[in-house]
């Protein structure tokens, strides 16, 4: 599996983001259930969010976020980064 970091950048006012946040988080939960998402959360200050994922390809990650309610509502843009971890905590070995 490949490793990815996705930066979600808000392109709308906080009030608009808040209206869709619950749907967005429910959608992210499907990524957790599929074993794709390792962790996620808002940036501080809340100008967007970060998601750490694993997957087979960048295309798989793009496809996942194509259906994110934030994306479908036109509220965000996404930056995608693939990386190769060379060091990690022992508990992350597998």
Residue ranges and their predicted role:
Residues 1-94:
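Conserved, structured core segments of small domains
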């Amino acid at each position: 599996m490949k490793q990815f970091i996705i930066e979600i950048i808000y392109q709308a006012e906080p009030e608009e983001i808040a209206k869709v946040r619950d749907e967005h988080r429910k959608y992210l939960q499907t990524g957790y259930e599929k074993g794709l998402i390792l962790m996620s959360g808002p940036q501080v200050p809340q100008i967007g969010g970060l998601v750490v994922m694993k997957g087979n390809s960048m295309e798989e990650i793009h496809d996942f976020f194509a259906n994110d309610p934030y994306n479908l509502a036109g509220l965000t843009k996404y930056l995608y980064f693939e990386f190769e971890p060379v060091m990690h905590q022992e508990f992350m070995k597998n």
